[in-house]
Amino acid sequence: PWTENTASVHFQQLCEIKIQKTNHYQQNTELIKRGCVWKDRLSTQNLQEILTQNPDAPLESVARNRQCVIVNTAQPLRLEVLNILKPWGHEGWYTGVEKRGVVKATDGYGKTELPYALTLFKKQLLADYSTALILLKTLNPVAEDVVGDLYYEMHEEKWEVYVVTEIDKGAWPSGTGIIKAGLHPDKIAEYQQNHAEKWPEVLLKDFKQAITEYENVRRQIDEPTTDISTELSAQELSLRKKATEFVGDCSVKVGDIVSFPVFQLHSLQHGIKVIEFQTPHYERLIVMFSQKVLTQKHWDTADALSKMHPEVYHQPELEKLYQSAGILVERFVDFPQFTADRISLDTGQTWDDQLGRQYHLLISISGQAAVFPENGQAVILNPEEALFLPVGMGSYRLISTADTPLIYLKAMPK
């Protein structure tokens, strides 16, 4: 259904359930559940032939034959990044599932599309949460001005947060970049002085008019038959500048965090790479764009401006959850749907965490981590690698193993 393909898809599952003793006296036990899932059907005879190849490890035999992941309720799932091309660069998806692409879990046996992997032992993987996970991705705009600028957009359902991981020095020589967000404070002050309490109404009216003038020129340029003259290019630049001056400048450096609740105008700019967590909504209102919009035939300017919050943008304040020598844990977002933390560990430091009844998503920014599940095998986490930690893991220990400090992000649903 996520691909909007109505054709039936046949798949099979093989599940293994073992009883594991949890203490020396064998008084307590728990079930270790593992399995794999693959598309298409194996006949009973073919399946039996595969199982007999290694009767001591039947699940491994099938997973290797089908080239699919072994899902273990006590073990992290490694998420393979899926690159999605964009007019401004590319996105790297870790949990995205829709018609444009479906991410996969991966291990030494093979790969499995994430929605299929999550159908195994759903209660132990997700508890009562949806298979539509918190969306985790990277945004990778090219460094070229204008070409690498994202849509000026606003959301009605989607909540999202960016963590800045890289700023291209060719685009921003000082190391400080600009993300456009909210209304510009100078514009607000100007309209408050000239229009008193009516300033929001007048400002948004003028903002809309400026965008309309720019859109008219933009559409001329986007027509394939248009001869783009020097005069038309100059007009496009002038009108774009006039429209974007209504939007505020949020200065960011590597490590900075910007969050966008609903109804907040924003645009990530060229050469600024970020990791993004967001709610699993695929909607937006396009206010304007400095290139041809390929995904729809219209801009949503009037609708967006009628709903946006007419205010200056302010970056979120970080909440310090824990600090000791070589360890810092900060909560950088607390949305209605999920929270996200940044954990920094010096070399050799450890951090113990509990899953409770919530899955965790981890992604590393720098350094290297060894993740030790309560009852599973250690997993290595390198920069820009991501893990899904199932509810059934219970708890885990994370150790900073590289010569450089470890910084990783964790998101979990509410």
Put a short name on every predicted segment:
Residues 247-259, 373-393:
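Short acidic-glycine-tyrosine-enriched beta hairpin
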Residues 218-219, 225-242, 275-316, 402-414:
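Double-stranded beta-helix
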Residues 152-155, 160-163, 249-250, 257-258, ...:
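His/acidic/aromatic-lined binding-pocket segments of jelly-roll/cupin-type domains
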Residues 16, 49, 257, 263-265, ...:
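Residue-level marker of beta-strand positions
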Residues 1-223, 291-314, 340-342:
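Transition-metal
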Residues 157, 167-170, 264-283, 378, ...:
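Ligand-binding loop in jelly-roll beta-barrel domains
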Residues 350-351, 366-372:
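Short beta-strand segments in beta-sandwich/barrel cores
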Residues 283-356:
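C-terminal amphipathic alpha-helical segment
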